């Protein structure tokens, strides 16, 4: 089994070679080479021409009754690192600012353990590219990567959390991450001179009305004890002060804790856009792009079992957490396979996606121990 120092060295190497979505070639090569150094007696490694930076490793069980999936993401963010660490990113403008280097290292630690201690059931490790963008989980599913013996019966995955103590495990019944949808609205009217509004059709005025009406969607269409949010964060219309704008674009996001909620918000937003178009006699087009960022809805039965194990294990600091309104594309895979996502505390003052994020490395070995323990427990229960 990998020692804590070996795990830390793996993490630091991965931290130095961050790569953006679908460009994780150095990362992929390092993962392949590292796994090649493990006991191969019951490992089967699979790569994919159609998704070149994806990687699957199947640990064949002694007497498998199921295949348990474990997923980690491998991509990084377009952030210029400002930690000043000796093992900082060597790729300018790219950083593991969301902790995917931690995720990968924990997965490698768990994989290494089961390469030396053959599990009862099959365990499928999925090293997924393109979580931050490009819909890596959805892309893998639609390409048919999860088929035959490579199809998990249940799926697990973690995300690091700087707000939790190092090595703590956080989870909850229900939704862990919100689903997110990108919103683009284009209003097309008629430009003209500011002195003659009767000869134009002002898209800025229509956009202002639309933005105000959108504020009622959550307050009047969503159950107040649930959480949903529409943020229209960008508006671009007009060119100069004395010209009426013939085109205005609004961009924003929708976030909701269930897929049903997101679909309700989507439909209400369509109604508002249609109504504004009729009221102002102009074309209003709405583009909604959710991609793979579905809500991360934990399976009730599996999550109850997961929480029970973590609560009853003396070496685990378990914390029940609130849902996060940020997104995670593991939600798409959990809509296809039952499973559970959870937090691993990394205790840092900086937040995810920050240029100064410095996870506490003591979390790595504690995470490996907690997850291997749970998987051993799951195979007996």
From Swiss-Prot:
It catalyses: N-acetyl-(2S,6S)-2,6-diaminopimelate + H2O = (2S,6S)-2,6-diaminopimelate + acetate. Pathway: Amino-acid biosynthesis; L-lysine biosynthesis via DAP pathway; LL-2,6-diaminopimelate from (S)-tetrahydrodipicolinate (acetylase route): step 3/3. One of its GO terms (biological process) is lysine biosynthetic process via diaminopimelate. Keywords: Amino-acid biosynthesis, Diaminopimelate biosynthesis, Hydrolase, Lysine biosynthesis. One of its GO terms (molecular function) is N-acetyldiaminopimelate deacetylase activity. Gene3D superfamilies: 3.30.70.360, Zn peptidases. InterPro entries: AcetylDAP_deacetylase (IPR023905), Amidohydrolase (IPR017439), Bact_exopeptidase_dim_dom (IPR036264), Peptidase_M20 (IPR002933), Peptidase_M20_dimer (IPR011650). Coiled coil: none annotated. The active site is at residues 73, 132. Its EC number is 3.5.1.47. PANTHER family: N-ACETYLDIAMINOPIMELATE DEACETYLASE, PEPTIDASE M20 FAMILY MEMBER. Belongs to the peptidase M20A family. N-acetyldiaminopimelate deacetylase subfamily. NCBIfam families: amidohydrolases (TIGR01891). HAMAP family: DapEL. Catalyzes the conversion of N-acetyl-diaminopimelate to diaminopimelate and acetate. This is N-acetyldiaminopimelate deacetylase.
């Amino acid at each position: 089994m990998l020692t804590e120092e070996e795990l830390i060295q793996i993490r630091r190497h991965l931290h130095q070679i961050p790569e953006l979505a679908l460009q994780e070639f150095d990362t992929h090569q390092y993962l392949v080479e590292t796994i090649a150094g493990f006991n191969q007696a019951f490992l089967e490694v699979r790569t994919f021409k159609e998704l070149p930076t994806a990687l699957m490793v199947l640990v064949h069980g002694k007497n498998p009754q199921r295949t348990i999936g474990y997923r980690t993401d491998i991509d990084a963010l377009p952030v210029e690192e400002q930690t000043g660490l000796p093992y900082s990113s060597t790729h300018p403008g790219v950083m593991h600012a969301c902790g995917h280097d931690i995720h990968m290292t924990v997965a490698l630690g768990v994989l290494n353990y089961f390469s030396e201690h053959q599990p009862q059931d099959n365990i499928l490790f999925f090293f997924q590219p393109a979580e931050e963008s490009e819909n890596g989980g959805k892309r893998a599913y639609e390409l048919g990567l999860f088929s035959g013996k490579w199809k998990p019966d249940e799926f697990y995955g973690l995300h690091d959390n700087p707000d939790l103590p190092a090595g703590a495990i956080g989870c909850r019944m229900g939704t862990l991450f919100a689903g997110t949808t990108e919103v683009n609205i284009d209003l097309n009217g008629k430009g003209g001179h500011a002195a003659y509004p009767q000869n134009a059709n002002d898209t800025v005025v229509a956009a202002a009305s639309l933005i105000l009406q959108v504020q009622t969607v959550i307050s009047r269409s969503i159950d107040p004890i649930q959480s949903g949010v529409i943020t229209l964060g960008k508006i671009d219309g007009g060119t100069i002060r004395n010209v009426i704008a013939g085109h205005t674009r609004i961009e924003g996001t929708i976030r909701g804790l269930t897929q049903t909620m997101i679909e309700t918000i989507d439909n209400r937003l369509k109604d508002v856009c249609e109504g504004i178009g009729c009221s102002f006699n102009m074309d209003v087009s709405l583009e909604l792009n959710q991609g793979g960022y579905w809500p991360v809805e934990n399976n009730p039965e599996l999550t109850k079992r997961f929480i029970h194990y973590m609560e009853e294990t003396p070496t685990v600091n378990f914390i029940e957490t609130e849902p996060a309104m940020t997104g995670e594309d593991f939600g798409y895979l959990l809509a296809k396979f039952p499973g559970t996502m959870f937090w691993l505390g990394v205790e840092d003052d900086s937040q995810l996606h920050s240029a100064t994020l410095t996870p506490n490395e003591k979390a790595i070995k504690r995470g490996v121990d907690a997850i291997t323990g749970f998987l051993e427990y799951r195979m007996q229960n």
